[in-house]
């Protein structure tokens, strides 16, 4: 759906961050990658541990490697102890999304909720993040809220939202799938 169609609201309801006005939502345990990546004035380690408080340093490095952020962090004098946020290291938009991806990967949940996971990233960074999600998301169910072709192209099914309602549904290989994909914003 387009901007304002209700995609992010639907995702927030499924994630349990908003209460539906009517009816009820039941969801599997899930990992939630929202549009906003919160960066706390703390160490990189503690920013990652928000996703999995019991994670070992080895697990943190594995998630950073999988997210494409490890080499940059290894180059920092303090490594995982590098301070982030005000008074510490600032991260670019691409690095923030990769940090969010590392947090996602630290959670072993069977469902991923991804709200515009590459919005605002340059094309090369977006392709890399999506390739990593595709490779690491095997065996999980994904729900992606997007208006971008590059993100929707990963889907097996497309739901088209307008004004908060599902207007259409297409399965990969069906007659309308390609047209629905083409109607989304190109890279």
Predicted regions located by residue number:
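Helix-to-loop junction immediately C-terminal to a conserved catalytic motif
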Residues: 15
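Hydrophobic anchor residue at the start of the ABC signature
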Residues: 101
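ABC ATPase nucleotide-binding domain helical subdomain, centered on the C-loop/LSGGQ "ABC signature"
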Residues: 45-85, 130-131
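Helix N-cap at the start of a conserved alpha-helix in ABC-type nucleotide-binding domains
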Residues: 123-124
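Conserved catalytic loops of ABC-family nucleotide-binding domains
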Residues: 132-144, 152
């Amino acid at each position: 759906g387009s901007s304002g169609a209700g995609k992010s609201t639907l995702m927030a309801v499924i994630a349990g961050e908003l209460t539906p006005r009517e009816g009820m939502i039941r969801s599997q345990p899930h990992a939630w990658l929202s549009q906003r990546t919160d960066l706390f004035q703390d160490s990189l380690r503690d920013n990652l541990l928000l996703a999995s408080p019991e994670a070992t340093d080895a697990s943190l490095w594995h998630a950073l490697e999988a997210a494409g952020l490890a080499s940059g962090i290894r180059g920092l004098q303090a490594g995982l102890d590098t301070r982030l946020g005000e008074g510490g290291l600032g991260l670019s938009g691409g690095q923030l999304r990769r940090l969010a991806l590392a947090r996602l990967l630290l959670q072993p949940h069977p469902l991923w909720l991804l709200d515009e996971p590459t919005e605002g990233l340059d094309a090369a960074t977006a392709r890399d993040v999506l390739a990593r999600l595709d490779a690491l998301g095997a065996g999980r169910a994904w729900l992606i809220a997007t208006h971008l072709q590059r993100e929707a192209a990963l889907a097996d099914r497309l739901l088209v939202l307008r004004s908060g309602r599902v207007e259409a549904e297409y399965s990969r290989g069906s007659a309308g799938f390609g047209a629905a994909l083409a109607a989304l914003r190109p890279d």
